[in-house]
């Protein structure tokens, strides 16, 4: 078995029993694949018929109203972005690229129109059609400098859906939902009448739609009902039994009697196959029925007197005595009637036609027009155009390929081609037929929550829809321009205005509900955000109206959506996460992978099934036992079939799960022993991992699940090797790899990776990359070269391993509080760096421009000490609350001066008092170090000194970077040919004769560029040198070009908003240690707040003197039912013990053979999965042991983890009691505690709910405008609300004066509080109380009602 570079350094012992069949697919593919299909940026020949290509092809050609011009689409190109991703974030720009569309304008001869089209001219050119945002490599968008994610949406799939309203008997309904266009509903009422609605407007008879489609009343009846023939004579009425098979299963309304008057089948009996045989054997071909039954029937088709041509009755007329007499008079003794006798099926349409007052197609069209356009006079042309535009014109109505596929599949017909996206007559007829079948109990209604009826709309599709909206507006503009512009040589550019496209796309990305500010607390929160599936948003549900069924877990979620990870609160169940192995198919339906079972043998062939396909199969669980030949061991197996859990014979199984973790999401798959936790707590655990703050130094979890490396790899925060090779150079900013050209099959000799340093994330956490490789290390493609934030050796590391004791300690762990050891604070375990961005904007005001300057009136020298001459803080300055970051003055209006002030001004030449200090200051409660300053200015006033200094520093840094990069390339090229050329014979060289041998000494005198000018006699060597020469020259040109581009980008002027003269951004790094009040959590939903940080000497300690790090309340476990944390603590303790064992071996000996024995015992004595230690050389073994001293990392995958026996065995090897308990001593007294305590290692996280961000106290601040009460909340620097219950408390104590103070001078008594301030300044202790402002507000509101209420100032004594 081969291990990657990072794995060799620290192999994780794995406990899973199940075989590894399929790798977890790339976690961000739902984002990247969707947008790749939309951009479709391949060359025109290889383009898919989707995304931009599809929209442009559907929208063009555009024809002018008079037919003289036609604009055709030919091709499109996506240009290069102006700035790269990093530059866009710095400048606050959008990472996008121009879309240029090649359009062909065809001009026809005006004279020949409209009879024929004679081409007069064809003009073709590329037209700019707006900017399209590009997706970064990690699946995000940079919009106005901030990273955003477009969340995928789960919405109802286009197609037809049948449902039942439980509130009314027989109220079945059908709804045809298109991808875009009008909805069409059909519904039954309690009387059995079928109604139709268009776009949920007023209902009308369903037969009106059929008539509008061109069907006559007779054709409608013929299509939806059977007919029977009744003959009549003097004896009575007889019903012909011509088609007995169609009557099978129906309840008879009459007796069937043979010629001898024997009853063959009795009335009210359900007709069976045996009965039909009896009737046929008896030779009965008709049966007598009475007039009461005949009078309930209706005529099946128009009855016409053939002799006179007179219409005796119309189709659907009731059979009456008069009608029968008229038939007899006309010589007709047989009558074709609608079959209500053997079946009720025909009655629904017949009854509906009775309600329908329209007679023909024209009347039906008018009726529909009246419903949709009430009040408009119906004109013949507009009536027909409206109806056709509703369902039959592709530009206005489209089922899309999904809708057409679903409609055909549901109706069970392939009559309509898959390429027809509008409705056909047969679709509407088929839907009504199926609805009647369901009403008759012959069909099933649809489950709307089944994932076969809900599809995922990903980012590419949403942007495509926005682009289509914008293009539709452009299309209208083109038509108008064609008719208005009168130009001899009209070109496509003259008639295309791309602004609507840019506006539509900008609106979607900046203010769309599904375009969200990326959650960037840690790599997991990024990955989870990109894999989120929301049922909310435009075209989706609203959280107020969503019921319990929609939110609940459905059987089809298995392997597609995670049943665990969803938010708590109003969005529960509406926002889901994609399961680990799930993918979205071409139609937008979620698919899960399964292993195929052939003839009882489980193969390694993988098939992805959608929820619709899965319903037809029997699927075994991943944990089902198999023998050596992959046959099932047991005869009876637990399986899933049609959404039910069943036990069935192994011979019936068709598929098997791929992995035990395939049902849960990436976040839930990170929780070890998930299977032992209550689902509610796991939900909290999965959600809280996303809130973990990356700490100063990341530490891997001792007990993991094996999913850590997958999440870290796919998050894009680690640097991954593109090619195999050797590390040539490493520092904190860059890693240089000398590429192994044979292994990587590339001509590139050098790979250079730049590291991200101290960058601010969206959540103000710090993104920093650290190299984990050393010079000379050999690496393979795909190896991790550098850790990102919250990763350790390429594994996700959100917290730290702490030694936990489950015991109470003096009430400090009451109600989930956490008692921490001071050692954790000293070791900076949970110290995190937060980077805050402060922005100062200088604007052009009415009174004059604001100015950033160090010359500020009435500010002491000490306050300006940290600023440079431009008035901007120095990088590296330590700033406290209230310190000036950017000094700025704002002009204020001139005021009238007294003669004295004018005199002073004249003497001292003072002009500064007409400006106000509006400097950017450090907010209260914060302090930190300035780590970066950015200055953006418009070009008008020229650049300030600080801006020029920053610009020069950036250019110098870029020059140095590119020079170093080229030096590395040069050294690599040099080393690739040096050994071959020394000692070779020369063909031609300056300073040497032909045939001379090249020496090392001669080469040392030449610069490397001159080496490459030497030619050699050996042809092979000459070719090699020639290749090196070409590569060297190309690299030089490329590096120089990149430097020039970078320089141009640095010097390029900044586009500031109108009225803005200058923007200064100051980045301050704030160090936050853990302290009481901070929130911490484990991975099992076990959260709490730090109550006290205890000195190490006072903490409980073990017999060997090791103090514990944390005390947790044991009462927090039984009621929460998250037992996984106990198992984690036990296994963590075993892991720690194994690490100690390895450390002891290292202290005794550093011989590889001895170390291998210890490692063999540690890794391979327990569990089924073995570690191949022979794959590591002696040096790697030694390195591995050094890295394992703190504990041996263990992977216990979800639903396939370590068993109790395994944990006990490991505890034994680690030298601990198998029950995981031990004797602890009180750190304060040294006495042992009465009982043994469970002690173990648990992985704990610091969450982004820090006390520093929440603690706040108001001194003086702003007041509400209306009530004049202090504002509330930290953001407004507000006060604490003294609410109703607090007032009761003071009343209960009888503290009248304190209460008066609270309600008046400390709140909204304006005059009182200003007097109070004056009295405090003067040293007086009196208090004058006036009327609170809120009382004045109340008084004015009462006056507004016409009641004069006033306050009586007089006292009772007067």
Swiss-Prot record:
GO terms for cellular component: DNA-directed RNA polymerase complex. GO terms for biological process: DNA-templated transcription. It holds the Pfam family RNA_pol_Rpb2_3. It is an enzyme of class 2 (transferase). It catalyses: RNA(n) + a ribonucleoside 5'-triphosphate = RNA(n+1) + diphosphate. It comes from the Bacteria. Its EC number is 2.7.7.6. GO terms for molecular function: DNA binding; DNA-directed RNA polymerase activity; ribonucleoside binding. The keyword Transferase applies. Signal peptide: none annotated. InterPro entries: DNA-dir_RNA_pol_bsu_external_1, DNA-dir_RNA_pol_su2, DNA-dir_RNAP_su2_dom, DNA-dir_RNAP_su2_hyb_sf, RNA_pol_bsu_bac, RNA_pol_bsu_CS, RNA_pol_bsu_protrusion, RNA_pol_Rpb2_2. HAMAP family: RNApol_bact_RpoB. NCBIfam families: PRK00405.1 (NF001616), rpoB (TIGR02013). The RNAP catalytic core consists of 2 alpha, 1 beta, 1 beta' and 1 omega subunit. When a sigma factor is associated with the core the holoenzyme is formed, which can initiate transcription. Belongs to the RNA polymerase beta chain family. This is DNA-directed RNA polymerase subunit beta. The lineage of its organism: Bacteria, Pseudomonadati, Pseudomonadota, Gammaproteobacteria, Thiotrichales.
């Amino acid at each position: 078995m081969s291990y990657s570079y990072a794995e060799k350094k620290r192999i994780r012992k794995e406990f899973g029993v199940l075989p590894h069949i399929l790798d977890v697919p790339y976690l961000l593919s739902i984002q990247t694949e969707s947008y790749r299909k939309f951009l479709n940026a391949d060359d025109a020949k290889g383009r898919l018929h989707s995304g931009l290509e599809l929209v442009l092809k559907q929208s063009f050609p555009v024809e002018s109203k008079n037919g003289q011009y036609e604009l055709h689409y030919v091709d499109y190109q996506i240009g290069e972005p102006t700035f790269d991703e990093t530059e866009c974030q710095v400048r606050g720009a959008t990472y996008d690229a121009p879309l240029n569309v090649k359009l062909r304008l065809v001009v026809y001869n005006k004279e020949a129109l409209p009879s024929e089209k004679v081409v007069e001219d064809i003009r073709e050119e590329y037209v700019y059609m707006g900017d399209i945002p590009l997706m970064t490599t990690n699946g995000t968008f940079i919009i106005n400098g901030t990273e955003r994610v477009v969340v995928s949406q789960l919405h109802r799939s286009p197609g037809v859906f049948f449902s039942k309203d439980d509130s009314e008997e027989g109220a079945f309904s059908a709804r045809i939902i298109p991808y875009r266009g009008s909805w069409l509903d059909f519904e039954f009422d309690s009387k059995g009448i079928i109604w139709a609605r268009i776009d949920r407007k007023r209902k009308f008879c369903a037969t009106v739609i059929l008539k509008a489609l061109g069907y006559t009343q007779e054709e409608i009846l013929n299509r939806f009902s059977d007919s029977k023939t009744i003959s009549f004579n003097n004896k009575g009425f007889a019903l012909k039994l011509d088609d007995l098979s169609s009557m099978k299963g129906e309840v008879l309304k009459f007796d069937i009697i043979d010629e001898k008057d024997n009853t063959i089948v009795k009335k009210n009996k359900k007709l069976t196959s045996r009965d039909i045989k009896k009737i046929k054997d008896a030779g009965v071909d008709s049966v007598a029925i009475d007039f009461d039954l005949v009078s309930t029937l209706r005529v099946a088709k128009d009855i016409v007197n053939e002799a006179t041509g007179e219409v005796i009755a119309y189709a659907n007329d009731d059979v009456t005595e008069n009608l029968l007499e008229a038939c007899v008079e006309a010589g007709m003794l047989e009558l074709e009637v609608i079959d209500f006798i053997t079946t009720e099926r025909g009655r629904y349409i017949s009854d509906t036609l009775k309600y329908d007052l329209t007679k023909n197609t024209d009347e039906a069209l008018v009726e529909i027009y009246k419903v949709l356009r009430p009040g408009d006079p119906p004109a013949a042309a507009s009536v027909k155009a409206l109806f056709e535009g509703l369902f039959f014109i592709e530009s206005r109505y489209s089922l899309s390929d999904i809708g057409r596929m679903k409609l055909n599949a549901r109706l069970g017909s392939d009559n309509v081609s898959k390429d027809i996206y509008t409705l056909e007559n047969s679709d509407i007829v088929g839907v009504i037929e199926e609805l009647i079948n369901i009403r008759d109990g012959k069909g099933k209604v649809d489950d709307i929550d089944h994932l076969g009826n809900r599809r995922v709309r990903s980012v590419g599709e949403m942007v495509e829809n926005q682009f289509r909206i914008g293009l539709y507006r452009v299309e209208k503009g083109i038509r108008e321009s064609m008719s208005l512009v009168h130009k001899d040589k009209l070109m496509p550019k003259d008639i295309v205005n791309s602004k609507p496209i840019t506006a539509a796309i900008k609106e979607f990305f900046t203010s769309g509900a599904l375009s969200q500010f990326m959650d960037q607390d840690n790599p997991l929160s990024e990955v989870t955000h990109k894999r989120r599936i929301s049922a909310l948003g435009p075209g989706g549900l609203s959280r107020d109206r969503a019921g319990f069924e929609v939110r609940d877990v459905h059987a089809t979620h298995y392997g597609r959506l995670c049943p665990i990870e969803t938010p708590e609160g109003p969005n529960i169940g509406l926002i889901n996460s994609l399961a680990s192995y799930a993918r979205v198919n071409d139609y937008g339906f979620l698919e899960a992978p399964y292993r195929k079972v052939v003839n009882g043998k489980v193969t390694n062939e993988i098939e992805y099934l959608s929820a619709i396909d899965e319903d037809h199969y029997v699927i075994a669980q991943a944990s089902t036992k198999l023998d050596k030949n992959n046959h099932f061991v047991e005869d009876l197996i637990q399986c899933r079939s049609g959404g039910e859990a069943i036990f069935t014979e192994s011979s019936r199984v068709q598929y098997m799960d791929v992995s035990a973790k395939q049902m849960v999401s990436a976040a839930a798959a990170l929780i070890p022993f998930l299977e032992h936790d209550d689902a509610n707590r796991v939900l909290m655990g999965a959600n809280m991992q996303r809130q973990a703050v990356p700490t100063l130094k990341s530490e891997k979890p001792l007990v993991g699940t094996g999913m850590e490396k997958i999440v870290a790899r796919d998050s894009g925060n680690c640097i991954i090797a593109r090619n195999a090779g050797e590390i040539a150079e490493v520092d904190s900013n860059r890693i240089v790899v000398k590429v192994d050209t044979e292994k990587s099959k590339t001509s590139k000799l050098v790979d250079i990776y730049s590291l991200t340093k101290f960058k601010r994330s969206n959540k103000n956490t710090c993104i920093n990359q650290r190299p984990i490789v050393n010079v000379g290390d050999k690496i393979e493609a795909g190896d991790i070269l550098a850790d990102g934030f919250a990763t350790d050796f390429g594994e996700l590391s959100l917290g730290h391993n702490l030694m936990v004791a489950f015991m109470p300690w003096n009430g400090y762990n009451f109600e989930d509080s956490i008692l921490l050891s001071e050692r954790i604070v000293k070791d900076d375990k949970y110290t995190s760096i937060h980077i805050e961005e402060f922005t100062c904007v200088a604007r052009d005001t009415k009174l004059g421009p604001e100015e950033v300057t160090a010359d500020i009136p009435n500010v002491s020298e000490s306050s300006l000490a940290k600023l440079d001459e431009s008035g901007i803080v120095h990088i590296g300055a330590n700033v406290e609350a209230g310190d000036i970051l950017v000094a700025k003055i704002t002009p204020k209006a001139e005021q009238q001066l007294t003669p004295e002030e004018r005199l002073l001004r004249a003497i001292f030449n003072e002009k500064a008092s007409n400006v106000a200090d509006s400097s950017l200051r450090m907010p209260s409660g914060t302090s930190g170090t300035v780590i970066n300053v950015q200055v953006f200015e418009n070009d008008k006033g020229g650049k300030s000194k600080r801006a020029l200094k920053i610009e020069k520093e950036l250019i110098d840094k870029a020059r140095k970077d590119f020079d170093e990069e080229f030096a590395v390339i040069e050294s690599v090229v040099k080393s690739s040919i040096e050994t071959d050329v020394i000692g070779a014979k020369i063909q031609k060289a300056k300073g040497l004769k032909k045939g001379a041998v090249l020496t090392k000494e001669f080469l040392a005198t030449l610069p490397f560029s001159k080496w490459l000018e030497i030619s050699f006699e050996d042809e092979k060597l000459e070719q090699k040198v020639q290749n090196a020469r070409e590569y060297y020259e190309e690299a030089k040109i490329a590096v120089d070009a990149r430097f020039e581009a970078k320089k141009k980008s640095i010097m390029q002027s900044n586009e500031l908003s109108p009225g803005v003269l200058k923007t200064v951004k100051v980045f301050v790094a704030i160090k936050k240690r853990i302290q009481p009040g901070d929130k911490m959590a484990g991975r099992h939903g076990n959260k709490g707040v730090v109550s006290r940080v205890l000195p190490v000497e006072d903490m409980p300690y073990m017999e060997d003197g090791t103090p514990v790090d944390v005390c947790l309340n044991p009462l927090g476990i039984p009621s929460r039912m998250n037992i996984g944390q106990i198992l984690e603590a036990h296994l963590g303790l075993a892991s720690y013990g194994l690490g100690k064992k390895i450390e002891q071996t290292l202290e005794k000996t550093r011989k590889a053979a001895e170390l291998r024995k210890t490692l063999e015992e540690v890794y391979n004595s327990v569990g089924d999965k073995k570690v191949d230690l022979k794959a590591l050389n002696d040096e790697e073994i030694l390195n591995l042991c050094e890295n394992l001293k703190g504990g041996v990392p263990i992977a216990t995958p979800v639903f396939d983890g370590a068993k109790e026996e395994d944990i006990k065995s490991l505890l034994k090897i680690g030298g601990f009691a198998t029950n995981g308990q031990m004797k602890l001593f009180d750190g304060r007294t040294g006495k042992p505690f009465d009982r043994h305590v469970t002690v173990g290692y648990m992985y704990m996280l610091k969450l982004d709910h820090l006390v520093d961000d929440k603690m706040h106290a108001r001194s003086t601040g702003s007041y509400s405008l209306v009530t004049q009460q202090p504002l509330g909340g930290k953001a407004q620097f507000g006060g604490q609300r003294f609410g109703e219950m607090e007032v009761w408390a003071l009343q209960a104590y009888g503290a009248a004066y304190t209460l008066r103070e609270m309600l008046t001078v400390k709140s909204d008594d304006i005059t009182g509080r200003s007097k109070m301030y004056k009295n405090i300044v003067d040293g007086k202790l009196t208090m004058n109380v006036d009327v609170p402002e809120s009382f004045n507000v109340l008084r004015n509101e009462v006056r507004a009602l016409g009641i004069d209420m006033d306050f009586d100032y007089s006292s009772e004594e007067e």
